């Protein structure tokens, strides 16, 4: 899309979450004729509502398909709204292009575009790239699935700026014209099949990131990915591979050191971010950063201090020789398996949460380094059961808040204290962020830091 594509065009914005508000605001700035549709009532006292109403925006507080007709030129939907929703289905039948907020925002951007997608590791990898670019003295603006709608930040950017986007499969489906200068796919696993229908459609959504790339642009792929040969064969972009071994084109390890283009940059033990999955994220971020002109010294300076994204196996602090990690985002068994396997030190494991019927016995093989289990939440008794099967001591508490002083008093120098619940938070907390914040705040209070 180009900026002129929206001028004087009739555009429906479907969904009134943060991205919908940002899209409506940006479309008004682009001189579009905007209608906003939402399934529920609008807060008419909200500043953005008042501002858009004054600008001539029409608001409709129902989402049946009578709201849309052939007079509309575009439908811009919230990425999370399924394509099976009545309004979206009707738009497609009427051949009305269905876009996301990101497509609207990119219509007016002509600087360097770096885009990151993948099933896992997107946010951590995007954050690493951002910090590496900044450490090298480059100016970069980060947006997308990482939390900030692109429309909120794109206005002041010029052709000299770099825009770094984290993109979900939901967003990519509504980006028909995206053409990144550098595109990265961290990995692809079967994910969001309730939204996409099957794995083939999910993979096709991920391919959208490179569909329009040309020979002077770069596509970075995981050398170990099952879909990598197919993507490499189909894309017009230059393919650059990353891998933990030396099949990588840019960065790899020999088991002891991080090696970038043949230079031994730093020992792996000096990297603050832990876990084999995070090593892949690091190598992917380095590959992007080197293509973007970042020095090895800048990369090293970031890896020495980057402790992770909040709530994602996030290093918090070391006190009295004990290292503390917040992995509240670990809402399923697989995530907690990854977290537990990231440490070889004696580990005090804090776990529990909403009981969704998961088989927690799958975690027993991952408990070899655990010295104490502290259990809470609806799954408390399931956690107790697997601890006993693994012959590990276990203590029950009522909440994360109560677990923290127990963990501190039970720890010794050289230990790791790990919150990795293996369950969603909704039995006791509104979301995993609130649960993780409680862990962080209680640590600070109990440790006096």
Curated annotation (Swiss-Prot):
For the keyword Transferase, the answer is no
Q: Give the matching Pfam families.
A: Mur_ligase_C, Mur_ligase_M
Homology family: Belongs to the MurCDEF family.
What keywords were assigned to this record? ATP-binding, Cell cycle, Cell division, Cell shape, Cell wall biogenesis/degradation, Cytoplasm, Ligase, Nucleotide-binding, Peptidoglycan synthesis
Q: Which gene encodes it?
A: murD
Q: Which domain of life is it from?
A: Bacteria
**HAMAP family assigned to the protein according to its UniProt record, in alphabetical order:** MurD
What's the Enzyme Commission number for this chain? Answer: 6.3.2.9
Q: In which pathway does it act?
A: Cell wall biogenesis; peptidoglycan biosynthesis
Q: Does the keyword Ribonucleoprotein apply?
A: no
The Gene Ontology biological process terms listed for this entry are: cell division; cell wall organization; peptidoglycan biosynthetic process; regulation of cell shape
Q: Which reactions appear under catalytic activity for this entry?
A: UDP-N-acetyl-alpha-D-muramoyl-L-alanine + D-glutamate + ATP = UDP-N-acetyl-alpha-D-muramoyl-L-alanyl-D-glutamate + ADP + phosphate + H(+)
Binding of ATP: at which residues? 118-124
Q: What does this protein do?
A: Cell wall formation. Catalyzes the addition of glutamate to the nucleotide precursor UDP-N-acetylmuramoyl-L-alanine (UMA).
> What InterPro entries does the entry give?
Mur-like_cat_sf (IPR036565), Mur_ligase_C (IPR004101), Mur_ligase_C_dom_sf (IPR036615), Mur_ligase_cen (IPR013221), MurD (IPR005762)
GO cellular component, alphabetical, reads: cytoplasm
Q: Where are the transmembrane segments?
A: none
Which GO molecular function, any one, fits this protein according to its record?
A: ATP binding
Name listed for the protein in its UniProt record: UDP-N-acetylmuramoylalanine--D-glutamate ligase
User: Subcellular localization, per the record?
Assistant: Cytoplasm
């Amino acid at each position: 899309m180009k900026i002129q594509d929206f001028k004087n065009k009739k555009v429906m914005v479907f969904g009134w979450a943060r991205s919908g508000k940002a899209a409506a605001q940006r479309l008004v700035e682009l001189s579009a004729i905007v209608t906003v549709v939402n399934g529920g009532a609008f807060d008419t006292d909200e500043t953005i509502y008042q501002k858009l109403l004054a600008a001539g925006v029409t608001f409709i507080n129902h989402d049946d398909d009578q709201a849309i007709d052939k007079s509309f030129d575009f439908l811009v939907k919230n990425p999370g709204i399924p394509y099976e929703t009545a309004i979206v289905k009707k738009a497609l039948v009427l051949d009305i292009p269905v876009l996301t907020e990101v497509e609207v925002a990119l219509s007016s951007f002509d600087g360097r575009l770096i885009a990151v997608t993948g099933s896992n590791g997107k946010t951590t990898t995007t954050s690493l790239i951002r910090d590496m670019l900044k450490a090298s003295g480059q100016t970069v603006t980060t947006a997308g699935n990482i939390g900030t709608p692109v429309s909120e930040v794109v206005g002041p950017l010029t052709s000299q700026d770099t825009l770094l986007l984290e993109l979900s499969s939901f967003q990519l489906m509504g980006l028909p014209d995206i053409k990144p200068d550098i595109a990265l796919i961290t990995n692809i696993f079967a994910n969001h099949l309730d939204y996409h229908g099957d794995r083939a459609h999910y993979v096709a959504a991920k391919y959208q990131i490179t569909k329009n790339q040309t020979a002077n642009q770069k596509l970075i792929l995981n050398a170990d990915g099952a879909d990598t040969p197919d993507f490499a064969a189909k894309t017009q972009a230059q393919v650059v591979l990353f891998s933990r071994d030396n099949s990588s084109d840019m960065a790899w390890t020999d088991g002891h050191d991080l090696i970038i283009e043949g230079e031994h940059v730093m020992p792996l033990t000096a990297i603050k971010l832990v876990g084999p999955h995070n090593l892949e994220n690091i190598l992917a971020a380095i590959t992007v950063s080197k293509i973007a002109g970042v020095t090895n010294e800048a990369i090293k300076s970031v890896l020495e201090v980057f402790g992770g994204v909040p709530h994602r196996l996030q290093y918090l602090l070391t006190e009295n020789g004990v290292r503390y990690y917040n992995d509240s985002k670990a809402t399923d068994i697989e995530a907690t398996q990854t977290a537990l396997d990231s440490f070889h030190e004696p580990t005090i494991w804090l776990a529990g949460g909403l009981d969704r019927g998961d088989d927690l016995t799958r975690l027993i093989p991952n408990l070899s380094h655990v010295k104490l289990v502290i259990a809470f939440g609806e799954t408390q008794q399931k956690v107790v059961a697997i601890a006993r099967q693994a012959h590990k001591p276990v203590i029950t508490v009522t909440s994360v808040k109560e677990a923290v002083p127990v963990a501190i008093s039970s720890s010794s120098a050289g230990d790791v204290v790990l919150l990795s619940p293996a369950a969603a938070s909704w039995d006791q907390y509104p979301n995993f962020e609130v649960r993780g914040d409680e862990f962080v705040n209680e640590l600070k209070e109990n440790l006096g830091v």
